Amino acid sequence: MKLLSVCAIALLAAQAAGASIKHMLNGFTLMEHSDPAKRELLQKYVTWDEKSLFVNGERIMIFSGEVHPFRLPVPSLWLDVFQKIKALGFNCVSFYVDWALLEGKPGEYRAEGNFALEPFFDVAKQAGIYLLARPGPYINAEASGGGFPGWLQRVNGTLRTSDPAYLKATDNYIAHVAATIAKGQITNGGPVILYQPENEYSGACCDATFPDGDYMQYVIDQARNAGIVVPLINNDAWTGGHNAPGTGKGEVDIYGHDSYPLGFDCGHPSVWPKGNLPTTFRTDHLKQSPTTPYSLIEFQAGSFDPWGGPGFAACAALVNHEFERVFYKNDLSFGAAILNLYMTFGGTNWGNLGHPGGYTSYDYGSPLTESRNVTREKYSELKLIGNFVKASPSYLLATPGNLTTSGYADTADLTVTPLLGNGTGSYFVVRHTDYTSQASTPYKLSLPTSAGRLTVPQLGGTLTLNGRDSKIHVVDYNVAGTNIIYSTAEVFTWKNFGDSKVLILYGGPGEHHELAVSLKSDVQVVEGSNSEFKSKKVGDVVVVAWDVSPSRRIVQIGDLKIFLLDRNSVYNYWVPQLDKDDSSTGYSSEKTTASSIIVKAGYLVRTAYTKGSGLYLTADFNATTPVEVIGAPSNVRNLYINGEKTQFKTDKNGIWSTEVKYSAPKIKLPSMKDLDWKYLDTLQEVQSTYDDSAWPAADLDTTPNTLRPLTTPKSLYSSDYGFHTGYLIYRGHFVADGSETTFDVRTQGGSAFGSSVWLNESFLGSWTGLNANADYNSTYKLPQVEQGKNYVLTILIDTMGLNENWVVGTDEMKNPRGILSYKLSGRDASAITWKLTGNLGGEDYQDKIRGPLNEGGLYAERQGFHQPQPPSQKWKSASPLDGLSKPGIGFYTAQFDLDIPSGWDVPLYFNFGNSTKSAYRVQLYVNGYQYGKFVSNIGPQTSFPVPQGILNYQGTNWVALTLWALESDGAKLDDFELVNTTPVMTALSKIRPSKQPNYRQRKGAY
């Protein structure tokens, strides 16, 4: 700790008042921390001006993808995701941390194994990816409770406010998680360059103080006190200016906001609502935070999907490649310097970690699928945009202008937004004025260039903007010292390979394009056809015009080779950095970008490095693929692909070419229906001999829950007793007086929940669920009861996660789970005494490896039978495909072996038949991890991907199912299969399985 001088204390006071330290560099104002102790650490690492961040003194555009490590509980797969994001041209990943998974019991912070952050930091560094850390404490994220642990329902204070009880509840978590993040900061050699306190702190109701500077300052101070010294950034839910620099107490260093402009209506994926394209972001930014780089911390890259929704394939169609072309280029038109796409890889809501508004899959329609595939066209389109930005540092120096329908394009049907450089290059973003238009619009452009104002095309013809498309036309674009006066075709990338320069341009089908280059040399077509191609020299300028074709053309002008491609062809090109060795990939910088090569190779290129006289590529293939290397270093002679020396040819343009043969292995998967299934009745609670004396008594006279007063004599809110996840079971005991004829009960489990009720062994009925219902009131007719006899009501509730808490003051997260009210006809409610259970131990959860949310309250779960090697030898043999003949819950377990060949990434899925018969619910456990909740009558999910590492691809696996029949005729699985999709020949390192502890008898299990 440093003793602060009087001046330093004055600076701290200035910071509290909203001041900042400024100095000038190359005409731009750099902003640094006003705390000199922190500035001493930061000034050479992460600073910023009004244009962009500087990292290690270099101006950098942050192009980032959102990834949640907790949604992929196989740390050895994180590198795969990072490398696929790096291949997009991105340089950063943003991540949330889910508090509920790390502090399942108040005061006990556990971040080990799959939940440890350090391995995430390590692989980010290995992949050359910076990190934006977003640990909350509130994260939203479509996570149960918005990331809040269930025990916060008992906190006597308003959440996300400066209420002392809430602040105290957050202290332990933030102290630990922020300290871990601090160790991973760039100042300590780690990848973390930004930290976000809180999340979408943007609105309030219900008399909550908002914005509450004291609250935000407390969250900021928590982080700083734990060692966070990187700049703090926020994500306002809209352009509200909350907590922007200069707003006073609770202000962040860099203001950012979110935007989901297309909304979440995946049921109508082709509908783009009128007026949803942002047009004022630049103006808003200049009003709210003109001294910081324009930052979009969450911009839409997909959509959530509710229970009963159309499915994530429809969400991927809604936020598709066309969306990316129009909306992301629109973001660039505002001068976005920090752009994070939510989600870039979604993952899975395994182990009950999701909120009630979503199901097991968190695919999100993202560029990377839930199973980590990169087969969606939107991934390829995003790669074009990402690599363009990476190759265009002058973009950050250009000043965004006002959009206009006149002055640049010759038709008002098009809108142009200029980003004008001062001798450093300009960019013109063109879109349809009606952004929803699907028309093909011809146009010409009037462009201000270093050669004067030019109307293009100059050599005849017109340009075309197809429907739901957008283009970035460059002017005075620097390609290693060669000035591209203009190009109407879009830039993918360019490289300087010493003796030659390469520029890759592309256009859409049926388009005509033109470029002008400041060179005196003649034009040569060195590859491809001369047809539909023309050129003309005008003084010291060469003008080239062509029609886009699927066949590649290479045009040479002096030492510049220009590749003219169509969009679908350029999807197969990659720009890996050329690393020094195979141990890690450097962070994106001017140097590493300049050292990159260009590879045409189909599915995926991960890395490239040189060793001795060899060029080594690591790449994945899903088909026999021609491979080309453009710009191989002059000192290498040999080519290795995935470690194998590969013969190649060199053409007249110096391009290496070879072919990688693909022959998919035969993947033999076990038949699920033919496994040796063992069966156990897992609703033993309805048996007349069942003893619940070991169960917790629901005997609280009051509830600490401040949201909803009790409407029962004793609290029946599950979180009051430490049960926050999965299935709940209640047992209500009463002595009949003979007057009881009906039982009315209101249960609450969240959207799409279900419940069933028994009186002794008599099934009374079920609420089978609807997405629209978070709670439901049911009335059941009782069989004849005998006066003086003991009876037990057994109520089973499937909880779907806790509500999020997005609006401050609502305390929605405190919406209880369990029984809200009940009425036994003819009796006072106090005539029933209750017991309840959820997962064994509640907050003293048994399975520290799989975490506090993974298992619920069924008998088999409480015993741990869902784990590998349960004591099933003497259990009955029965199959879930035969199922149950009456209401209840069956537990089925079986083992099987897999022998998936190494060197292949083979996505595996458990598929359920889509039944239209009686309603039932299934939980899928794989090697102890709950990896699926299937609800037959609601859907939409029927296919559940389970990653390698949860599944043992070379070894023994255990699968367990809980089958809950909600209706009187029972239920069975129509079908249940393990299937694979296309095997990918991969360079991915060996996958280490996540820990899968076997069954051990649990002390105190009931």
Swiss-Prot record:
Substrate binds at Y96, N140, A141, E142, N199, Y260, Y364. Transmembrane segments: none annotated. Keywords: Carbohydrate metabolism, Disulfide bond, Glycoprotein, Glycosidase, Hydrolase, Polysaccharide degradation, Secreted, Signal. GO terms for molecular function: beta-galactosidase activity. Disulfide bonds join C205-C206, C266-C315. Coiled coil: none annotated. InterPro entries: Betagal_dom2 (IPR018954), Betagal_dom2_sf (IPR037110), BetaGal_dom3 (IPR025972), BetaGal_dom3_sf (IPR036833), BetaGal_jelly_roll_dom (IPR025300), Galactose-bd-like_sf (IPR008979), Gly_Hdrlase_35_cat (IPR031330), Glyco_hydro_35_CS (IPR019801). PROSITE patterns: GLYCOSYL_HYDROL_F35. Its EC number is 3.2.1.23. It is found in: Secreted. Belongs to the glycosyl hydrolase 35 family. This is Probable beta-galactosidase A. The lineage of its organism: Eukaryota, Fungi, Dikarya, Ascomycota, Pezizomycotina. The gene is lacA.
